[in-house]
């Protein structure tokens, strides 16, 4: 808002000065000052009254007022929040005092709180509660947000102050964590166009603006296909499916006003059990194609053209900074350091993974032939026949295991682990005390179980629904800081479990249980943070998966098995012989899991190290996989047209390798626990 008003008054001043220089100059300066004051009054009024901007109040250090949130307030909130932040930035940049850590770096850490609150609501509307109305607002606002960001990163006076602090003698007097904040702040500007001038700076900003539009469209196109493509089946097509899966599919159909039918929604949690258990091969193929063709249906929501433009713009942008390719720029400040080091790790594992897939396919084909099924193993057969082999070889039925994996019990198991490792205690908060964005969401207070001190809040949004993006993820509304008084974290976990019929328990697969623990690891990272400054929360991308992958190891520890793996009907604990069968099958199907992941990670890196001029993403994906020797019997975990990790934003672009990089760290850490006297619950190692 403020930027638009200033631009208008500047043009008016120029017009006046052309006719009456002296008088116009005086009047225009007065007009500009009055207009600026008026605009800031409007901004301050919005911050005080707009539900998306107001300070969070209530218990637990203040919480987001989701019960008062309305899309009607979003545009005004974003505009006012950006204007307020730019006013703060201008004050920092034009401070007449010499630049110091306190008046420049800490001042920047402190700035922008109202807009940060708005983006907490934005994140929920984007990922958990999307709608056509929000997507239209998102389309309109994303370019403005990009322009606002460029206005900050290309503020020459601001960057000069940051650089002065970075190069000053004061750096030697700062604590290590303060030095790290300065380093990250400087890099955040220098690596994002602050050193550019003239046409190069203008082009850099224009590229970022266009990328913001493309990233938004990519994500919304995938979400559209997840909502629009639902496979409905009838009672005579349920062969092979368990009662719990059938019940979940019936509930999903009922929610869509298709009573008497069964809905396989276009999400992994819904697709996976169908491909694993359904005897209907034609339907397995239909469900498989529906899922893996998200964003690739040749219609207005097709993402291939967007991918090409995204890659071209990213490459051009880093070229302005002097880099050979996007991956070189991206990995420069990551643990891997260079694309070559990341590629070396992945390519070292790839041949063994593919060889294992070939063995798995041979076993499946032999089983199919023995059964007289008269088929050649195809991608929609992989899960189905591997499940048959698992049952034959290990006497292990995934459906049998699911009877011991109730969502509520697994949640309690995670709380137990967090208590043993971090001394955290999770206490459910009565519904209605803390506002939530959907009735499915529940909140727990996290305290130190020894001292009783408040740590933060944990929100859980467990179920799939229309408007919620697929997959599982962790996020936060507030991170821990102490530089300006202690702030307590507000952390969230989000899943897409299929909601059962009312009164029915939520049973989940072993893979989903593993993912549940994985994402809780991210939440624990947020809750256990102990840093002074906001910039220090998180970590480099190829490290951030370490803590989440490590927590997966606690899913199958004895205390969790003995106390939380209980049968849904009998309440009996999982028998030892079933535990032994699960242990025996621990590495079963690893060819599939490793190869589908690595294919995505390798294609990501090849995309971002290749000249993207005239690139055809569909052909590039196909030719790259062929060159790698990708088995025909399985796809990438994320095909390019729905690879949101790398194309709906830049968080994981040229960075999907990070899961494998972190797995190396995870193996070392897990070994340290395993060798400790107290095992995975050893206090000293924890």
Where are the regions a protein language model picked out?
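A broad, structural surface signal
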Residues: 72, 76-94, 106, 110-113, ...
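Gram-negative bacterial Sec-dependent N-terminal signal peptides
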Residues: 1-27
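N-terminal helix-rich structural modules
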Residues: 25-243, 248, 679
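C-terminal, non-catalytic "cap/extension" segments appended to globular domains
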Residues: 36-73, 80, 240, 261-263, ...
């Amino acid at each position: 808002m403020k930027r638009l008003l200033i631009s208008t008054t500047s043009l008016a001043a120029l017009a006046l000065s052309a006719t009456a220089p002296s008088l116009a100059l005086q009047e225009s300066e007065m007009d500009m000052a009055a207009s600026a004051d008026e605009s800031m009054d409007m901004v301050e009024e919005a911050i005080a009254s707009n539900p998306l901007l107001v300070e969070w109040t209530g218990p637990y250090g203040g919480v987001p007022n989701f019960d008062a949130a309305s899309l009607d307030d979003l545009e005004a909130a974003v505009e006012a929040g950006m204007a307020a932040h730019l006013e703060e930035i201008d004050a920092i940049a034009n401070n007449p005092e010499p630049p110091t850590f306190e008046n420049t770096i800490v001042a920047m850490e402190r700035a922008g709180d109202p807009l940060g609150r708005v983006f907490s609501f934005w994140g929920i509307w984007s990922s958990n509660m999307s709608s056509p109305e929000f997507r239209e607002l998102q389309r309109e606002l994303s370019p403005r947000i990009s322009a606002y960001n460029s206005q900050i990163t290309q503020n020459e006076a601001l960057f000069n102050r940051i650089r002065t602090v970075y190069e000053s003698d004061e750096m030697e007097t700062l604590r290590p964590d303060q030095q790290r904040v300065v380093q990250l702040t400087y890099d955040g500007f220098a690596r994002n166009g602050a050193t550019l001038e003239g046409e190069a700076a203008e082009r850099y900003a224009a590229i970022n603006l266009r990328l913001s539009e493309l990233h938004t469209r990519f994500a919304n196109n995938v979400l559209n296909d997840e909502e629009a493509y639902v496979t409905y089946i009838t009672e005579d097509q349920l062969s092979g499916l368990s009662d719990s899966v059938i019940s979940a599919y019936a509930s999903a159909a009922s929610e869509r006003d298709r009573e008497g039918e069964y809905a396989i929604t276009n999400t992994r949690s819904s697709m996976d059990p169908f491909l694993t258990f359904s005897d209907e091969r034609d339907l397995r193929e239909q469900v498989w194609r529906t899922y893996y063709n998200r964003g690739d249906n040749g219609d207005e929501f097709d993402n291939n053209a967007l991918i090409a433009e995204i890659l071209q713009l990213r490459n051009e942008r880093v070229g302005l900074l002097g880099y050979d390719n996007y991956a070189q720029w991206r990995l420069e400040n990551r643990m891997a350091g260079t694309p070559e080091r990341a590629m070396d790790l992945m390519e070292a594992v790839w041949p063994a993974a593919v060889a294992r897939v070939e063995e798995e396919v041979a076993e499946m084909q032999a089983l199919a032939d023995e059964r007289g099924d008269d088929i050649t193993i195809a991608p929609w057969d992989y899960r189905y026949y591997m499940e048959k082999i698992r049952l034959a070889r290990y006497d292990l039925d995934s459906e049998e295991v699911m009877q011991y994996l109730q969502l509520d019990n697994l949640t309690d198991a995670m709380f137990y682990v967090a208590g043993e490792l971090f001394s955290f205690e999770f206490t459910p908060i009565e519904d209605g005390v803390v506002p939530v964005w959907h009735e499915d969401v529940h909140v727990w207070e996290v305290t130190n179980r020894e001292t009783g001190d408040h740590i933060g809040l944990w929100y859980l949004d467990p179920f799939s629904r229309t408007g919620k993006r697929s997959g599982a993820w962790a996020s936060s509304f507030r991170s821990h800081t102490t530089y300006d008084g202690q702030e307590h974290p507000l952390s969230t976990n989000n899943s897409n479990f299929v909601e059962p019929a009312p009164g029915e328990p939520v049973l989940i697969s072993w893979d989903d249980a593993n993912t549940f623990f994985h994402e809780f690891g991210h939440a624990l990272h947020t809750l256990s943070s102990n840093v002074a400054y906001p910039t220090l929360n998180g970590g480099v991308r190829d490290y951030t998966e370490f803590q989440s992958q490590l927590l997966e190891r606690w899913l199958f520890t004895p205390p969790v098995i003995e106390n939380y793996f209980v049968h849904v009907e009998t309440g009996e604990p999982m028998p030892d012989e079933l535990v032994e069968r699960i242990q025996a099958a621990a590495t079963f199907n690893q060819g599939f899991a490793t190869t589908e992941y690595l294919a995505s990670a390798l294609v990501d890196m090849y995309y971002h190290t290749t000249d993207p001029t005239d690139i055809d993403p569909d052909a590039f994906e196909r030719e790259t996989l062929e060159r790698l020797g990708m088995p025909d019997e399985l796809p990438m975990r994320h095909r390019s047209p729905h690879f949101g990790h790398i194309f709906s934003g830049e968080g994981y672009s040229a960075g999907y390798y990070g899961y494998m990089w972190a797995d190396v760290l995870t193996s070392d850490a897990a070994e340290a626990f395993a060798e400790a006297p107290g095992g995975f619950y050893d206090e000293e190692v924890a």
